[in-house]
Amino acid sequence: MAEVIKGKVVQVIGPVVDVEFEGVKELPKIKDGLKTIRRAIDDRGNWFEEVLFMEVAQHIGEHRVRAIAMGPTDGLVRGQEVEYLGGPIKIPVGKEVLGRIFNVAGQPIDEQGPVEAKEYWPMFRNPPELVEQSTKVEILETGIKVIDLLQPIIKGGKVGLFGGAGVGKTVLMQELIHNIARFHEGYSVVVGVGERTREGNDLWLEMKESGVLPYTVMVYGQMNEPPGVRFRVAHTGLTMAEYFRDVEGQDVLIFIDNIFRFVQAGAEVSTLLGRLPSAVGYQPTLNTDVGEVQERITSTKKGSITAIQAVYVPADDITDPAPWSIFAHLDATTVLTRRLAELGIYPAIDPLESTSKYLAPEYVGEEHYEVAMEVKRILQRYKELQEIIAILGMEELSDEDKAIVNRARRIQKFLSQPFHVAEQFTGMPGKYVKLEDTIRSFKEVLTGKYDHLPENAFYMVGTIEDVIEKAKQMGAKV
C-alpha cells in the first residue's frame, strides 16, 4: 500500500487554503485532491467534525500548494494535518448512485445512508479520443412534438434552455427525464450549479412524486456554497454520466442548471487565486474552463451524453462574454416564453425563437424539413398579421390571410401537449408522440383538411387522431 503523504495548513483566506508539504519528493499535482478534518459548531452550539476536501490549484514555493476548499473553511486552524489523496477526488459511479443526491465530492446528502458503490472514478477525466467519438448524427426522439419537429436534438448534442421564472423549465426537464427513462430506458443526471437550495429540494420532491427519481442522479452545489463547489460540481455530474455512457452503453441526459453560475464561480476562484481578470471581470481562462466541461459531453461508439443546460443571460446582454462562450458549444436553443405560458400553451416553447443546427434536410430528411419550415412560415406570417388584427380586426384581412390566421391558431394549439409528469395537476393523461406521427400529423394540418375543426380540439392532444376524437366529443362534424 502506497505511503500516505501528509502536510499541514499554514494559511486560510476564505475558501483558499495554503498547505505545506515538508520533506516530500514531489508536491501534489494541480487538480489533485487533499482532505482534512473540519471542526466547527453547529446551529445548536454543539461541536461536530466533517471531512473537508480541497483541490490543488497552484504551487507556491518549493513545499507549498494553494488549494480551493470544496466546503466551508470555518473551523480550520493553522498547523492541522492535511492528507494527500494521491490523485483527483474520486466520485462513486454505477447503478448504486441512482435515486440519490450527492455533493461535489460524491458524498450522499439525502440522509438515506451510505452509497455502496463498487467503483469510484476521478472527478476529472479527459474527453473521449476522436477515434472513440461517433460521427453518426442520430436524432434523439424526445416524444415532445415542438422539440422533435422544430428544433431536433441529436444524441451527444448540447441544448441551451432559456426562460424566466415560472414558464415551465422544471416541468419540461422532468418530462424529458421521464421519456428517456420510460421509452429509451436511459438514465439522467441533474446537476444544480449555483441555484437556489429551495428549488433543488422542490425538484427532488417533484421527482419523487412523478416517479422519475429511480432513473436519476442529482448532484448539487447550490448558491450558498463556496465557489470551489459551484465551479467543480458539473465535473462530478459528468463523471457519473460518463460511467453510464462508457460502461453501461446508455444514452444519458445531463441537465445543468445553471451553466452561467459555473462561469461565475470560475471568476470568483480566479480572483481568489490572484489572476488578473479579463473582459467584464471574468477569468482569463474563461473559454478553457467552459471547454473542459463541454468537450466531455459527446457521443461515443458505446453511448451518448446529451446535455440540456439552462443559460442565464446577465442583463439580457447576449454579447456578455459568459453566455457568448457557452453559445459557441450549443447545437440547439430552446426558448421558453411567458407570452405562450399566459395563453396556457405548454410546453411554452417559442417555435420561432428556438433553433437547431440539425434542422436541415441532410440530417432529418426532406419531408421533416419541409413540414417544419412550412409550420414556421405560417406562424411567422401570423405573428406579422397580429398587429393588423389588433388595429383593424380580422375583417380587413384578405381571404388568404384569414385562412393562414385560422390555420396558425390551430398549429399553435397543436404544439401544446399534455405531460406525463403533470398528470396529477392537469388531470390529462400524458402523451408521448413518435417523430413519424408528429411529422404526419402536422403535414395533414398544413393541407387545410382540418381547418373546419374547432380550435380547442387541437389543444393539449397528441396526434391528429386525438384531434379528430376530441372534435367528435365536442360535437363537431368531422
Curated annotation (Swiss-Prot):
- Coiled-coil intervals: none
Where is ATP bound in this sequence?
Answer: 163-170
Describe its membrane topology: Peripheral membrane protein
Which GO-annotated molecular functions does the record name?
A: ATP binding; ATP hydrolysis activity; proton-transporting ATP synthase activity, rotational mechanism
Assigned EC number: 7.1.2.2
Q: Which UniProt keywords apply?
A: ATP synthesis, ATP-binding, Cell inner membrane, Cell membrane, CF(1), Hydrogen ion transport, Ion transport, Membrane, Nucleotide-binding, Translocase, Transport
Localization in the cell: Cell inner membrane
GO cellular component, alphabetical, reads: plasma membrane; proton-transporting ATP synthase complex
Question: What reaction gets catalysed by this protein?
Answer: ATP + H2O + 4 H(+)(in) = ADP + phosphate + 5 H(+)(out)
Which NCBIfam families does the record cross-reference, listed alphabetically?
A: atpD (TIGR01039)
Concerning its family, UniProt says: Belongs to the ATPase alpha/beta chains family.
**What is its biological role?**
Produces ATP from ADP in the presence of a proton gradient across the membrane. The catalytic sites are hosted primarily by the beta subunits.
Q: Which PANTHER family match?
A: ATP SYNTHASE, ATP SYNTHASE SUBUNIT BETA, MITOCHONDRIAL
Q: How does it assemble?
A: F-type ATPases have 2 components, CF(1) - the catalytic core - and CF(0) - the membrane proton channel. CF(1) has five subunits: alpha(3), beta(3), gamma(1), delta(1), epsilon(1). CF(0) has three main subunits: a(1), b(2) and c(9-12). The alpha and beta chains form an alternating ring which encloses part of the gamma chain. CF(1) is attached to CF(0) by a central stalk formed by the gamma and epsilon chains, while a peripheral stalk is formed by the delta and b chains.
Entry protein name: ATP synthase subunit beta
What species does this protein belong to? Aquifex aeolicus (strain VF5)
Its taxonomic placement starts with:
Bacteria, Pseudomonadati, Aquificota, Aquificia, Aquificales
Q: Which gene encodes it?
A: atpD
